[in-house]
Amino acid sequence: NIITIPEDAETNQWTENHWNGGGVYIINGTGAGQFRRIRSHTLTKIELDQPFLVQPDATSEISVTTVRHHLYFINNEAVDVGAYQLYGSVQNCVISGMTMTRCNGIVGRGSLLYRGKQPEWYIDIVNCRLKEGNYSHWFGIDDRGHSGHQSINLIGSGGTGMSIGTVIRRNVLSEYSYIRTSPGANPDAVTDVIIEDNSFDIAKNAVLLGGNATNTSGVLIHNNRYN
């Protein structure tokens, strides 16, 4: 369960055992999409709590960052607010039964944040309702371009593999609410997404896949209803 850190690795706040309990994420290359917790580490070696199922190799890109996982947000409501946002490193989480009215929407943000690549993997956004989809962000005061239509938005910026394995299912989106991806310039920044059994009522774009053909990849859009 030991991995060796390359001599040319880019590090930040990397002192012995400072990141115990944190996570080692394979974000690209062989073994991508796996993470393990750190049991202990020196400046050159990391001991994991358990081995990877697929071992990393010289093609693998690894990020060491915080672990936030197994979180459940059930049957909450928001009116006239900003985003209900998963910000940075989050894994194996569920947002279910959320009702939003005139908000920025539900945002899953896997990004390069505070000098660390913080991926967002294996999120379920299900059984939510987004209604009255016009959103005004400090309109007329300091909008900063944030006003627009309410959305379920998957962000993957700052590298490959920032957003992997999100399921968006059985949501009701009305009055210009919609689903979108917002990848950065890297290939597979947002990947392996299921958009299924959702209902749309009045939308400029029901589903908008951002970037080019490789920035957002591996998307299944199935059995949605459009009015």
Predicted regions, residues:
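Small/polar beta-strand repeat architecture
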Residues: 1-90
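Parallel beta-helix/beta-solenoid repeats that form elongated, surface-exposed shafts/blades used
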Residues: 33-37, 75, 100, 132, ...
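Hydrophobic pocket-lining residues within nucleotide cofactor-binding pockets
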Residues: 52, 130, 173, 200, ...
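Extracellular beta-strand/beta-solenoid scaffold signature
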Residues: 61-63, 77-87, 102-120, 134-160, ...
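Leucine-rich solenoid repeat scaffolds
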Residues: 218-227
